[in-house]
Amino acid sequence: MSEKLYPVLPEAKKNTLIDNETYLEWYEESMSDPDGFWAKHGRRIDWFKPFTKVKNTDFNGDVTIKWYEDGVTNVSYNCIDRHLKSRGDKVAIIWEGDNPYIDKKITYRELYENVCRMANVLKKHGVKKGDRVTIYLPMIPEAAYAMLACARIGAVHSVVFAGFSPEALAGRIVDCESTFVITADEGVRGGKPVALKENTDTAIDIAAKQYVMVNKVLVVRRTGGKVSWGRGRDLWYHQEVASVEPHCEPEPMNAEDPLFILYTSGSTGKPKGVLHTTGGYLVYASMTHQYVFDYHDGEIYWCTADVGWVTGHSYIVYGPLANGATTLMFEGVPNFPDQGRFWEVVDKHHVNIFYTAPTALRALMGAGDEFVTRSSRSTLRLLGSVGEPINPEAWEWYYNVVGDQKCPIVDTWWQTENGGILITPLPGATDLKPGSATRPFFGVKPVLVDNEGNVQEGVADGNLCISDSWPGQMRTVYGDHKRFIETYFSTYKGMYFSGDGCRRDEDGYYWITGRVDDVLNISGHRLGTAEIESALVSHHSVSEAAVVGYPHPIKGQGIYCYVTLMTGADAQDPDELRKELVQHVRKEIGPIATPDKIQFAPGLPKTRSGKIMRRILRKIAEDEFGALGDTSTLADPGVVDDLIENRQNKK
């Protein structure tokens, strides 16, 4: 753990919405009087019919979660219509294309017309309240229009990341029995086309074999690339929207009506359809967006995620737009045309708040500082991190090099299931420790539990649970409430189990140590892989590291490290560097963490969202590379061949 403490910056304190005193006061109120607290903050969104009930939740038995259950509202209305009077001409979405010379600005009034037209197209083709619509689009404005159009008419959207394979798309279409798909001819990423329409056609054929028939496909023309056409089924978006009205009344929605399904992989079985509902989700997404990012009217906010992930739902679309913010959507990748792209976009659009993932930061850090320092980044005020624990070395680089020591970093912990950020610093209230997500957001009760279910008090290590509900929490697994209870509420009775390990320090700060299934047991000692990875990455030659366990004849599990080197570091003698890294880890953590195998690799197997696929790394480490399972979601499947070829553990 990093011992360094970074006090709240004077500049952040000066203009903040929440200082430390306010944080402590509000947090105490949210614990002692959740009904009163959430009633007050529930009014941050507009209700067609105000709620009289606030919290009705039970983590035992059949697990019911209801918030604002008698209130009536509409998410699309809250994200668009209510802003038209005061900020109709304000930019709602800045779209930055994959090509650095292409961008577009969409005002709230233009957003209204685009969303209403798309909503009317859906209605024209028979989509009704409660129907599931699958959205398989690249990061273009139409992705946001599609989500908001579904919300407007009460259809439930299921966004599938445009990097997923036809098989993955088909599985998601089948699971929620979706009959309407919105896609594009092609996507563009890093200058290369992605065959979305072709993938959609394949997925529809696969779904049909499982008796789910897609009736209509709305196709956005992104590249003008050639596509095959299903007569009577396929529709051009640009033709359809031209023939409908730019006005559509928002459907009155009960607070507990479904808003969206988003599939997330579990440790077992097929992906789970995480179901989020209307009222509580929007209250929580908008409130966390405002206070975690200390958002002030007029600022330019950029979350680099994709709408195919929950971060894109909550912090590109719903949270920012509910707050009347200007949100930036980026179609491209961090390293195209080169590794300076993020910072050039920051300068070009005068970005004030920047929210990205540690995996991107580590890759950019490995490319060298000059890609960062050639930009001014003078408009940046706040930096954020999401998706996985950020190792202290990447945190320090982000703070010192990207932020020039003038931007607080909000290292946020949350999950698809949570709807919004649960543990996080607040920039004007929280002293920072590199690598720590620090303190819980309002209304969030973290509990550390040992493997026997005993609650750990004070300084402790344990399994991270949340002991009471918050408005943004998922309500069920779509079509499988039993799986919902088994996955999240059966391990520790009466608590939501996150699946993550965590440490609480003497200041009450929380340190996420990685998935509990990523914990190694070395000679009877528990070690989080994140700790070993962090130690490796703190070495000046290492850009990125992933650590897994493998069967060891003496210790039970051995430590197998995959290491990607900094540019230029591969000139060293590999055996010498291995010895150096072993000593470095021993020094950082202790002899118990001595790596057994270190394999140098040009890249790690990652999904297109940047998550490292540890399952594949485990199999290679165990020499079971015949059983790698599905590798179709990998960004670069060629990486796997290199890993197998050069594995350190050949039998």
UniProtKB/Swiss-Prot annotation:
Catalytic activity: acetate + ATP + CoA = acetyl-CoA + AMP + diphosphate
Binding site for ATP: 387-389, 411-416, 500, 515, 526
Gene3D superfamilies membership: 3.30.300.30, N-terminal domain of ligase-like
InterPro entries documented for this protein: Ac_CoA_lig, ACAS_N, AMP-bd_C, AMP-bd_C_sf, AMP-binding_CS, AMP-dep_synth/lig_dom, ANL_N_sf
E.C. number: 6.2.1.1
Keywords: Acetylation, ATP-binding, Ligase, Magnesium, Metal-binding, Nucleotide-binding
Pfam families per the UniProt record, alphabetical: ACAS_N, AMP-binding, AMP-binding_C
Modified residues annotated as N6-acetyllysine in this record: 611
GO biological process assignments: acetyl-CoA biosynthetic process from acetate
Binding site for Mg(2+): 537, 539, 542
GO cellular component: cytosol
Cofactor(s) annotated in UniProt: Mg(2+)
HAMAP family on file: Ac_CoA_synth
Role description: Catalyzes the conversion of acetate into acetyl-CoA (AcCoA), an essential intermediate at the junction of anabolic and catabolic pathways. AcsA undergoes a two-step reaction. In the first half reaction, AcsA combines acetate with ATP to form acetyl-adenylate (AcAMP) intermediate. In the second half reaction, it can then transfer the acetyl group from AcAMP to the sulfhydryl group of CoA, forming the product AcCoA.
Name of this protein: Acetyl-coenzyme A synthetase
Organism: Brucella suis (strain ATCC 23445 / NCTC 10510)
Lineage: Bacteria, Pseudomonadati, Pseudomonadota, Alphaproteobacteria, Hyphomicrobiales
